[in-house]
Amino acid sequence: MLSQRQLFLDHLGQTSDFPLMLEIERARGVYMYSAEGKRYLDLISGIGVSNVGHRHPKVLQAIQDQLDHYLHLMVYGELVQSPQVQLAEALAKTLPDPLNACFLVNSGSEAIEGALKLAKRYTERPNLVSCLNAYHGSSHGALSVSGSEQFKQGYRPLLPGVSHIRFNHPEDFTHINEQTAAVVVETVQGEAGVQVADDSYFQVLREHCDKVGALLILDEIQAGFGRTGTFWAFEPYGVVPDILVAAKGMGGGMPIGAFIASPEIMQVLKNNPILGHITTFGGHPVSAAASLATLHVIQEEKLLEQVSDKARLITERLQHPAIRGIRQRGLMMAVEFESFDILKPVIDRAIELGVLTDWFLYCDNAMRVAPPLTIQ
């Protein structure tokens, strides 16, 4: 009989020639357990997903409660489904006005696609601007606004009318003009290795977008839902985006995403044509119930208030001559080494010792540290 690992290689589409190949049987809290019974401390939260830990009891209960009522009923946007309505209302309460219209989808890439369409439809403009070294997803449009040619070159031609500027370089804003529908920016650049903007960057960007009439889309797929110590990473910057994108940590381990805007902007998807953006499974009631429970856990267990102390404790312990520095916002950290050749054995040894971490897509000399917010 073939092993699970061999069946994994034989029958599942692969993403690289070197998957981790850990066979995980169960998970709880900050730990995952292999089929052989080995325990792994999850320091990456499934790449920013398990913000409240694996299988949080309140998330599980919300899922079970929804299973007892219904699963999929109808394509998104037709029936009044309580999990969707309650989640959208709760999200609006975490956000400043006028961000109180929420379109639910299945993932971060889908949320980016919806946000790009919304911006083009609302402004009736053709062009988009994003940042070099940005990662917004793997679908066609999301890949187009991502900022690494290495990952795009095999799939061209991509969307026309997309240009890229440097992150945290306001002098590049001259590329944002009256033909720009939107500027899409990660509030914290994730796959570039946790690149954090200067305090004034987003304020200047907001002012420039207003000046030329371009929308500002902030991508908080990785940085949102408490990861940085505030519920939304943009809060300390004193700006409000026109469109906000969320996913990953939003679902407590279930697949869900959202793009959020003002009712004025969101309403353009309703007509000319009708059904301007549709999804069969977006906002699935089980995922929506899990997301609402996740939001409540973050608030009720006061996880935001704990992020700073936990981050400080981790950074205090990450002291070693091989570590060149640590970039961070809350529990979103990049531990920098001189090179990938030095970092890779560290990651391999950590996994051998039962600690799961990895490196970043565009920054392979930095170790990703982004544990569940529930870590003690």
Task: Tell me what each language-model feature is.
Residues M1-Q376:
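Conserved N-terminal phosphate-binding loop of PLP-dependent enzymes in the Aspartate aminotransferase
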